[in-house]
Amino acid sequence: MARSPRIRIKDNDKAEYARLVKNTKAKIARTKKKYGVDLTAEIDIPDLDSFETRAQFNKWKEQASSFTNRANMRYQFEKNAYGVVASKAKIAEIERNTKEVQRLVDEKIKAMKDKEYYAGGKPQGTIEQRIAMTSPAHVTGINRPHDFDFSKVRSYSRLRTLEESMEMRTDPQYYEKKMIQLQLNFIKSVEGSFNSFDAADELIEELKKIPPDDFYELFLRISEISFEEFDSEGNTVENVEGNVYKILSYLEQYRRGDFDLSLKGF
């Protein structure tokens, strides 16, 4: 393979190099002064005579031009009233991810809203009606985030939390893991409510047999499958024990196939 010929520096190369160096240094200085962000490590400024080939020089010119281009949001910044600085690229990414999470949550609520929910062994309305009486997050265990507003971010730690949370929640596996954790947490809640109660032990074993997505729908549709029923200090022992028997009755119906779990895998 033939080697690329060594570059011959022309006057127009010198002029373009000087212009790009000037613009690059000005960009670095301006960003440091206005936003406190040091971009020195983001772009090299080699001596002109260090380029061995025209290809090397052209590649650097592209990098320098991109670095100083106002359309490159990676190197454009905003500073809010709390002194938090972020690149416009990061702000736009969090906004996109937030919108995607909102879309996913809306889809999930739409898929479940017409399902009946039960209390005391009887249908009491739809999940949508239950949500209207409380909130989507209370019923579904899924929080719908508000629109991202950078002007309200008070600290860098809050910005990182929002960035990481929204990115994580765009992954479909997030919701699968959440269903698994919800089931485990509920089982622990039942376990922590009794020292010795045969029916509770039976309930725990039955709950462990249920696939997480089935459990999630049962959690949505059966009011007795609720953390409040077991964690509330106001509940008497008799009430909690009675709730165990109610849930066991529901699970017997579940095993017989009396519940249409059409949200499975949604």
From Swiss-Prot:
One example of a Gene Ontology biological process annotation: symbiont entry into host cell via disruption of host cell wall peptidoglycan
Region listing for Disordered, in residue ranges: 1-73
Gene Ontology MF term list: DNA binding; hydrolase activity
Result when mutating S232T: Complete loss of priming activity
Name listed for the protein in its UniProt record: Primer terminal protein
Effect ascribed to mutating K27A: 88% loss of TP-DNA amplification activity. 80% loss of in vitro DNA-binding. Impaired nucleoid localization
Chain positions covered by the region annotation Interaction with the viral DNA polymerase: 256-258
Region forming the signal peptide: none
Keywords, sorted A to Z: Coiled coil, Covalent protein-DNA linkage, Degradation of host cell envelope components during virus entry, Degradation of host peptidoglycans during virus entry, DNA replication, DNA-binding, Early protein, Host nucleus, Hydrolase, Phosphoprotein, Viral DNA replication, Viral genome packaging, Viral release from host cell, Virion, Virus entry into host cell
Keyword Transmembrane helix carried by entry: no
UniProt function note: Acts as a primer for DNA elongation during viral genomic replication. Acts as the small terminase protein during packaging. Recruits the phage DNA polymerase to the bacterial nucleoid. Primer terminal protein (TP) is covalently linked to the 5'-ends of both strands of the genome through a phosphodiester bond between the beta-hydroxyl group of a serine residue and the 5'-phosphate of the terminal deoxyadenylate (dAMP). Hydrolyzes host peptidoglycans during virus entry.
Modified residues (O-(5'-phospho-DNA)-serine): S232
Region (Priming) location: 173-266
Extent of motif Nuclear localization signal: 25-34
UniProt-annotated site: Positions the 3' end of the template strand at the active site of the DNA polymerase, residues: F230
Region Intermediate: start-end pairs: 74-172
Consequence recorded when altering G257V: 90% loss of primer activity
Record annotation: effect of changing F230V: Formation of TP-dTMP is directed by the third nucleotide of the template strand instead of the second
